[in-house]
Regions:
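Short C-terminal tail/terminal secondary-structure segment
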Residues: 123, 210, 221-222, 232-247
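Short, small/polar-rich loop/turn modules that mediate ligand/substrate recognition or access, typified
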Residues: 150-154, 232-234
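Active-site helix of classical SDR
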Residues: 98, 134, 142
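Substrate-binding pocket helix/loop in short-chain dehydrogenase/reductase
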Residues: 74-75, 79-85, 113, 178-182, ...
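Residue(s) in the substrate-gating loop at a strand-loop-helix junction
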Residues: 118
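Alpha-helical segment proximal to the catalytic Tyr-Lys
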Residues: 103, 146-151
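Conserved mid-core segment of classical short-chain dehydrogenase/reductases
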Residues: 42, 53, 59-62, 70-84, ...
Length: 247
């Protein structure tokens, strides 16, 4: 199941669904639902159950809580509306989704729940009082859920740093300048001529290095979803190229 919020993402979701079905021989479903609303997570689970329970049996094996927003402002500029939006999507959304999905999790510890946190929960990036706080809450919930759901699923979080995509592109020059020192000293964020895209190599001259590729972060998610990760729960697994070695 692929969740998206805005109608503008419908075609992208459809294209991704077709690609996954063709490549892996699986069934997919795109569901439009706003996880930042009280009813959104429950509606999402209901839609998935209706679509995939034609045989009578229904089970949710893997959940990746990836929805998130980042609204960066220093203390004097923080607005209550920004706080509410961020915590509704980043904190309340995952909680309500797990609440709605819990009845359908396995009963043999084989389930996998992966929460997307951020290095911001630990690094104290300037301008991320709200975002960093929301991701720290996600890490706290990860540990709680690991205990409450111990007979149903493992629950872990990963904490990426900058990742190539729309959220990274939306960062201001001021914010990028503020994290440049971190990037310069992150081992795997060094841009490589002839390996990384030319525009990333060029951007690294001012930003300090390149962001992670989505595939690099997804690989760690996949690892935690595997049977080999069955003895790992309640952990925050680094997925940031070594950025938190500075912490």
């Amino acid at each position: 199941m692929l969740n998206y919020t805005s109608a503008s993402s419908a075609s992208l979701t459809s294209d991704l669904s077709k690609s996954l079905e063709s490549k892996h021989g699986i069934k997919t479903l795109g569901v439009q639902a706003d996880l930042g609303t009280p009813q959104g997570p429950a509606d999402l689970v209901a839609a998935v159950k209706q679509h995939f329970s034609d045989s009578g049996a229904f089970q949710i094996d893997i959940i990746v809580n990836n929805a998130g927003v980042a609204l960066n402002n220093k203390i004097p500029e923080v607005q209550v509306s920004e706080f509410e939006t961020t915590y509704k999507v980043n904190v309340l959304g995952p909680l309500l989704l797990i609440q709605a999905a819990q009845p359908y999790l396995p009963n043999d510890r084989s389930g996998r729940i992966i929460n997307l946190s951020s290095v911001s929960s630990s690094t104290g990036f300037i301008g991320q009082s709200v975002y960093g706080g929301s991701k720290a809450a996600v890490e706290a919930m990860t540990r709680t859920w690991a205990r409450e759901l111990s007979e149903r699923a493992t629950v872990n979080a990963i904490n990426p740093g900058p990742v190539l995509g729309p959220m990274y592109a939306a960062n201001t020059d001021e914010f990028k300048a503020g994290i440049k020192g971190w990037i310069e000293h992150t081992p795997l964020m060094r841009a490589r001529q002839g390996i990384d895209a030319d525009e990333l190599v060029e951007d690294a001259k001012t930003s300090g290095g390149r962001p992670a590729y989505t595939s690099e972060v997804a690989g760690i998610v996949g690892m935690l979803c595997s049977e080999d990760a069955a003895w790992c729960t309640g952990q925050v697994v680094c997925a940031n190229g070594g950025m938190l070695m500075l912490h």
